[in-house]
Amino acid sequence: MMSMFRLSIPISASELLLASTVFCLVLWVVKAWQPRLPKGLKSPPGPWGWPVLGNVLTLGKSPHLALSRLSQRYGDVLQIRIGSTPVLVLSGLDTIRQALVRQGDDFKGRPDLYSFSLVTDGQSLTFSPDSGPVWAARRRLAQNALKSFSIASDPASSCSCYLEEHVSKEAEVLLSRLQEQMAEVGRFDPYRYIVVSVANVICAMCFSKRYDHDDQELLSLVNLSNEFGEGVASANPLDFFPILRYLPNPALDFFKDLNKRFYSFMQKMVKEHYKTFEKGQIRDVTDSLIEHCQDKRLDENANIQLSDEKIVNVVLDLFGAGFDTVTTAISWSLLYLVTNPNVQKKIQKELDTVIGRARQPRLSDRPQLPYMEAFILETFRHASFVPFTIPHSTTRDTSLSGFYIPKGRCVFVNQWQINHDQKLWGNPSEFQPERFLTLDGTINKALSEKVILFGLGKRKCIGETIARLEVFLFLAILLQQVEFSVPEGTKVDMTPIYGLTMKHARCEHFQVRVRTEGAESPAA
């Protein structure tokens, strides 16, 4: 037995030297590949990844859930690899506020992802990697144009603003269509009608135009928003495995075609506006941008001058900002109402008490309807249907929570984790609008600000204010007049389908009943 341990394999000096050289080379490559860390900083922790694949298999079909689980193990700042690309993942409200707000200039970039380059030919304000002064100035220009034809007052209308006027009209048309469906079929899929109503609101603001609910041109585009969301969602393999772009890929071909169709639609609308444009007679957002484009003065704003092509890009960005999130929010809201009928009754009791039936709800009623507001906040939190912000990237070498983050690092911001953080919410899986109400029945402002859906900081959604108002007014008008339900025993699938905005499975068993109770009206 002992003789076995005395056996040795002779190694020559040259073999020993070769082995030592190879070992040193491998060690040098590993150290060279790792970033040099400034003194006192660490690299973010994270799970081991497979060669070539990285951690893509860990993400699965629900990356927001997988990364939330990883944050429990590695903390609010962790790093994964998708393919060979390192990705920083941020969780936790304080950490995300630190990055996007207090260190906003460091984290305001966008990664140069392949899917982003397909959106408006890579010239989108929302998806473009550009984050410099020209981008910031054009973003302000787009935001101001949208504000001028949404929350600004319309002197020719009795409504408080353009948005209230458009939503009030579309909500009435929507109610009529739903009741027609009830009379003809006895049930309906609400998403089919909500999507056109919301699209008409943003079309009115951008183009002074609305479409019929059966208009095939509009329907062919807005009903494909799911596919767009899947194409630009965080962790899309196409962005991290370049070889997939050169293999037969029907989904990629469809995504390219969808972007071309959206662009052609917007291009046609802008061209029509040029034909009828009159300086001094600004009708809508597109006219406002055309006016700016034709202003050739060489002043301090010359660097943000919009070309005709850029107008199409900006309008397309605004259409997206004012359409998909609102449609998804209202659709999820109706799902929660039919699965929580007592919540629906409480909202309607509040509407009856505050407004009655003598007039439509207005935006000015919002502060007097705290339970309605609490319901919307809880829908945003519980559904958390924008699980990640659009990916960010760092614009320079920086640090966060003691970790070194190099310039150009792709960053995923996990909004779903914040909205389901047990430390913040106690019972995050429960749908409970009352959590947002104080003892005196008003909105708990501090808690409401912890619901994150529209991003934070310099890349925050430019349509957030409009979206919140639009969701409120649509729901208030609908619930004042009708009650939503599904037949007893109908199973409603609440499982979210992952994408930039997470949709639910379509439900074709919705019903509405015109309300007769609570018809006594307080003074207007």
Swiss-Prot record:
Subcellular localization, as worded in the UniProt entry: Endoplasmic reticulum membrane; Mitochondrion inner membrane; Microsome membrane; Cytoplasm
UniProt cross-references to InterPro entries, sorted A to Z: Cyt_P450 (IPR001128), Cyt_P450_CS (IPR017972), Cyt_P450_E_grp-I (IPR002401), Cyt_P450_E_grp-I_CYP1 (IPR008066), Cyt_P450_sf (IPR036396)
Keyword field contains Repeat: no
Gene source species: Canis lupus familiaris (Dog)
Reported function: A cytochrome P450 monooxygenase involved in the metabolism of various endogenous substrates, including fatty acids, steroid hormones and vitamins. Mechanistically, uses molecular oxygen inserting one oxygen atom into a substrate, and reducing the second into a water molecule, with two electrons provided by NADPH via cytochrome P450 reductase (CPR; NADPH-ferrihemoprotein reductase). Catalyzes the hydroxylation of carbon-hydrogen bonds.
UniProt induction comment: By polychlorinated biphenyl (PCB) in liver and kidney.
Family: Belongs to the cytochrome P450 family.
Residues bound to substrate: F228
Full protein name: Cytochrome P450 1A1
Gene this protein is translated from: CYP1A1
Alphabetical GO biological process terms: estrogen metabolic process; fatty acid metabolic process; retinol metabolic process; steroid biosynthetic process
Secretion signal span: none
Keywords of the record: Cytoplasm, Endoplasmic reticulum, Glycoprotein, Heme, Iron, Lipid biosynthesis, Lipid metabolism, Lyase, Membrane, Metal-binding, Microsome, Mitochondrion, Mitochondrion inner membrane, Monooxygenase, Oxidoreductase, Steroid biosynthesis
Pathway: Steroid hormone biosynthesis; Lipid metabolism; fatty acid metabolism; Cofactor metabolism; retinol metabolism
Gene Ontology cellular component list: endoplasmic reticulum membrane; intracellular membrane-bounded organelle; mitochondrial inner membrane
Record's catalysed reaction(s): an organic molecule + reduced [NADPH--hemoprotein reductase] + O2 = an alcohol + oxidized [NADPH--hemoprotein reductase] + H2O + H(+); estrone + reduced [NADPH--hemoprotein reductase] + O2 = 2-hydroxyestrone + oxidized [NADPH--hemoprotein reductase] + H2O + H(+); estrone + reduced [NADPH--hemoprotein reductase] + O2 = 4-hydroxyestrone + oxidized [NADPH--hemoprotein reductase] + H2O + H(+); estrone + reduced [NADPH--hemoprotein reductase] + O2 = 6alpha-hydroxyestrone + oxidized [NADPH--hemoprotein reductase] + H2O + H(+)
Cofactor(s) annotated in UniProt: heme
